[in-house]
Regions:
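Catalytic glycan-binding domains that act on GlcNAc-containing polysaccharides
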Residues: 1-152
Length: 152
């Protein structure tokens, strides 16, 4: 996610106001930290340690979210497009297909489609480089649900 969001640039800032390595919106960071990031406090989101901590917490939150349920494809879509948009897309698209690749291509947001494809590709490239198994790639290739499992 970090590679796609900021290309490892700690000072990255989006036009929408997302900040830091994980490109966290201040409202999302505040929800994860249970404190607000307003005004000058928003600049704390450029601190790599805090940004990674909150970004990792948000990824874990999304993986457990009822709309995602451990599905790494849905997690990436929710990270970029938001859980609310993902819920709408799921209701609309899953009526037509359960194939994960068709789901990606059917999402109405080009930005989210591209994000999901790049994040998953990067995830599998890193897993391959470290000699790790890629059950989520195998699942998607077989048209099945790609459930994330930590290797730690």
């Amino acid at each position: 996610v970090m590679r796609q969001e900021s290309a490892f640039n700690t000072r990255a800032k989006s036009h929408a106001g997302a900040r830091g390595l994980m490109q966290l919106m201040p409202s999302t960071a505040g929800y994860m930290a249970r404190k607000r990031f307003r005004g000058g406090r928003r600049n704390k989101l450029y601190e790599p340690g805090l940004n990674l901590q909150l970004g990792q917490k948000y990824l874990g939150y999304l993986l457990q979210h009822e709309t995602v349920n451990g599905n790494i494809l849905m997690m990436a879509a929710a990270y970029n497009g938001g859980p609310g948009n993902l819920a709408k897309w799921r209701r609309r698209i899953l009526k037509l297909t359960s194939d994960p690749l068709l789901f990606i291509e059917s999402m109405p947001s080009r930005e989210t489609r591209d994000f999901v494809e790049r994040v998953l590709s990067n995830f599998w490239i890193y897993r391959d480089r470290f000699g790790q198994k890629m059950p989520t790639l195998d699942a998607i290739a077989a048209g099945k649900t790609p459930i994330y499992k930590s290797i730690d």
